[in-house]
């Protein structure tokens, strides 16, 4: 194991995969049913920007008294609501979703992102995928790995893939998590501990450090990876970015090509 690999051997005083008040999904049908909810992968809010929108929307609507606003006003109001993920909180009053509500809608455990500042919580959740949607796509793995799974998780973020696998009742034997954000790493590490995971969590801070030698070392140690999974390498590709989205042409977005590089490595060894 190289020096900057951090292996966390955490105590597991409890039996099973979860904690008493947070059981795993009991059936395949439950996961599929929950996936029918709206796609909330782009939920994100910025308190500094939405304050202005709140006031504008209220003034625009109240200008018409009790009458129906003009079509162009209704269009502008709805655009602002969609843009900033606002909800109606009373007559002519809109409000931002708070981080706890975002966690709920995205399918993360309650308090998943607690412990970091509010702004960072919004950023982390805005760059995340909807957990139950991820679980739906991973459902096929449930019966294939009754003894647990080895995961190479690239651009892990706050652990959406790990949470989804756990929710399906799949034991996480070994997880190599590649993530640069310290805040996101803290969130995943805390979740790993709180859910009493029985396996090993190995943290790597830079995807460019995932070399042939290290992949060979991990595969020799674990007996291979069962799945390589990855999120968006930066907000340039995420729904939370409303300003500059250059796709794979973005400077940091080029890191996405490391995903295919690493996948080829795993398949060739």
What are these regions (language model features)?
Residues 1-269:
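Conserved active-site and SAM-binding loop architecture
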